[in-house]
Every structure is written in structure tokens, then in C-alpha cells.
A protein has these predicted regions:
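Extended hydrophobic/aromatic segments used for targeting, binding, or gating
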Residues: 82-118
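Membrane-interfacial catalytic/cofactor-binding modules of polytopic membrane enzymes
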Residues: 1-74, 120-142
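Active-site His/Glu-centered metal-binding helix of metallohydrolases
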Residues: 76, 80-81
Length: 142
């Protein structure tokens, strides 16, 4: 699947469509599982992470470990940009993304599904998970 097809599948609209950001926000925040949130969030970034990080890792490692490494890599790339701009070493987003990766794995393992709730409740649950992971990451930032 190429990038354009991937984005159309995730957002329901073609790459560059005027309502793609809106669709991404509605679909990701309204996801009934935290793992589904990540299926819709930032499809361009997730396409390349999946193709060049997750899938190659999954060949040699268990899927859960591959997912955690992919989340940590994504967080580290975000941290790296901040470190270059600030010219100072700090890791906040790496542990944040790693914690969110753990939430994806735990949620899928425990079969946590809140898709029967209304969109505002689903969005609140997803925002709560993301915010909770960020608060914990602030406590352990390096």
C-alpha cells in the first residue's frame, strides 16, 4: 500500500484534502480502543514508522516489543528535534511515548473496549490516557 492509499484508508479522504485534519481528529479521539487511536493519528508519520521501523522489527522480535521500540523511537525523534533546538539533552517525549505504547499493549491484552460509549466519552478516555502518560513521563524525565 502506498502513502496516498494509506492516508485515504485512515482519514477517509485523499492526501492534502482540506478536511483531513478534522477527520483525523474525529476518528482518532473518538476511537473505542487506545490502539485504534493510533491507527488514525498522524497517518503520514505512522505510515513511515510502520514501514521502516515496526514491520522490520516484527520480523526478528515479538510484536509487543516491536511496538514498544517503535513508540520509543518516535518519542526519541521528537525529543531529538527539541534537543537540537535547545542545544540541551532532555528526554521527556521518549518515556511519554513508551508509556503510551505500554497502554496500547495492555489495552489490547485486557480487551479494553469503550466503543459503545458516545464520542465525547471516548474522546475523554483517550485524552485521559494520553494526559496520564504525560504526567507520569514528567515525573521520570531524563
Amino acid at each position: 500500500m502506498n502513502l496516498s492509499d494509506y492516508i485515504r484508508k485512515r482519514n477517509g479522504v485523499p492526501l492534502g484534502a482540506s478536511n483531513s485534519l478534522r477527520n483525523m481528529m474525529i476518528r482518532s479521539l473518538g476511537a473505542g480502543k487506545f490502539s485504534k487511536f493510533w491507527k488514525y493519528w498522524n497517518p503520514i508519520w505512522s505510515y513511515y514508522l510502520g514501514k521502516y521501523i515496526f514491520k522490520p522489527l516484527k520480523i526478528i522480535l515479538p510484536p509487543a516489543l516491536s511496538l514498544l521500540i517503535t513508540f520509543a523511537f518516535c518519542g526519541f525523534i521528537h525529543d531529538l528535534v527539541i534537543m537540537i533546538i535547545r542545544w540541551d539533552f532532555a528526554l521527556l517525549l521518549t518515556p511519554w511515548f513508551l508509556l503510551m505504547g505500554f497502554c496500547v499493549i495492555i489495552g489490547d491484552y485486557a480487551k479494553i473496549d469503550y466503543s459503545k460509549f458516545t464520542w465525547p466519552i471516548r474522546a475523554s478516555i483517550n485524552i485521559l490516557i494520553i494526559s496520564g502518560c504525560l504526567l507520569i513521563a514528567y515525573q521520570i524525565q531524563i
